[in-house]
Every structure is written in C-alpha cells, then in structure tokens.
C-alpha cells in the first residue's frame, strides 16, 4: 500500500515517459493515457502496474533522489547529482550526521544532504536571502 503524501513516479508505456507527482487522496492523475485513480495507486505497491480508465498499464515507482532533484524549481544555479555525491562522500554524510550548509539556493544540495543524513540526521542551512527560502 502506497501512503498518501508519497512522491511517486508514473512510468507510461508511451515512449517510456516518467511523471513525478505527490499522491493525494481524491486527486486522480489525468494524462493522454487516461485517468489514473488515486485510490487505485494507494491500494497498489511500489513497482506494480495500475491500469488507467483506458486500460493502459502505468508502472508506479517510488521517487529516487535523482527524481526529486529533477523536480526542483531552479531559482539559482543547481549542483548536479554527481557533484552532490562527491560532496557527500567528502563530508562523510550519513545517517545520524548533522551538516551545516551556507546558502540553500534552489535546494539541490540541501535535498541530497538530507537524503544521505536520513531521518536520524539533520541539515542546518543558513540562507541570507529570504526569497530563496520560499
């Protein structure tokens, strides 16, 4: 069962396209391949196929770190995944660690650091410009 509020990736058979969406109760997903019921996705498991109103199979996957980074709105220059991985490696980022960051910008590095620190760690970010914090 996929919890509501989860970030999911819908993979269509039509040119193998990927769509990143947050699963919300009562919020069906509409596409050229038909309507995908939020309740049907909620009842499924990650990795399974759910059929649309047009009987087209859509694969439902859990969003990876890469998917999350691709979905960020970019107000500033973003740090790319290969650079984020190198920075996390050099910092020794991992579960339970606390990392202090100067400037969060578009949030790419902050997202990566949070991913590697996990639920037991934390990222403290100081941003001088208020508009980047929104």
Regions found by a protein language model. Name each.
Residues 89-94, 115-116:
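Glycine-rich helix-loop-beta junction characteristic of Rossmann-like nucleotide cofactor-binding loops
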Residues 94-105, 124:
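Conserved class I S-adenosyl-L-methionine
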Residues 106-119:
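Conserved SAM-binding loop of SAM-dependent methyltransferases across substrates and taxa
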Residues 126-134:
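S-adenosyl-L-methionine
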Residues 71-85:
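Conserved SAM-binding loop and adjacent beta-strand
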Residues 77-80, 102, 106:
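Short, conserved glycine- and acidic-residue-centered signature motifs
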Residues 1-59:
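N-terminal auxiliary segments of SAM/dcSAM-dependent transferases
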């Amino acid at each position: 069962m996929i919890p509501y509020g989860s970030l999911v990736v819908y993979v269509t058979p039509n040119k193998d396209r990927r769509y990143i969406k947050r699963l919300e109760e009562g919020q069906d997903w509409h596409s050229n391949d038909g309507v995908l019921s939020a309740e049907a996705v909620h009842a499924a498991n990650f990795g399974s196929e759910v059929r649309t109103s047009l009987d087209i199979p859509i694969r439902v996957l859990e969003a990876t770190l890469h998917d999350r980074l691709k979905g960020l709105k970019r107000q500033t220059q973003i740090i790319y995944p290969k650079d984020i991985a190198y920075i996390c490696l050099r910092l020794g980022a991992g579960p339970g660690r606390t990392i202090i960051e100067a400037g969060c910008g578009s949030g790419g590095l902050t997202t990566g650091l949070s991913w590697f620190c996990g639920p037991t760690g934390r990222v403290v970010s100081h941003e001088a410009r208020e508009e980047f914090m929104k």
